[in-house]
């Protein structure tokens, strides 16, 4: 009985692992990158950074160094090589 239960458990685990697919990766460049990022961020409920946010840093150019990922990084990660939706969402 224990052997049958162990075999059933192992079969269940093997079937579950085989159905788990890694997240698809694609290359996103230019307008396709901008549109995809805008759509994903909109669906996630993230708004574009406003000018009011820049005011607390003194200059707009200081903001990328203080929080989040810079815009140049997304091209490196998603245009020059494939990236997943999770990586794109990290730039929202």
UniProtKB/Swiss-Prot annotation:
Which SUPFAM superfamilies does this chain map to?
Insulin-like
Q: How does it assemble?
A: Heterodimer of a B chain and an A chain linked by two disulfide bonds.
- Which Pfam families is this protein grouped with? Insulin
* Family membership: Belongs to the insulin family.
**Which PROSITE patterns would you find in this protein's record?**
INSULIN (PS00262)
The transmembrane segments are none
Tell me which positions the record assigns to the signal sequence: 1-19
List the disulfide bonds in this chain: 29-79, 41-92, 78-83
State what protein this is by name: Bombyxin A-7
Q: Which organism is it from?
A: Bombyx mori
- Annotated CDD domains: IlGF_insulin_bombyxin_like
Location of this chain's protein in the cell: Secreted
GO molecular-function terms, A-Z: growth factor activity; hormone activity
Role according to the record? Brain peptide responsible for activation of prothoracic glands to produce ecdysone in insects.
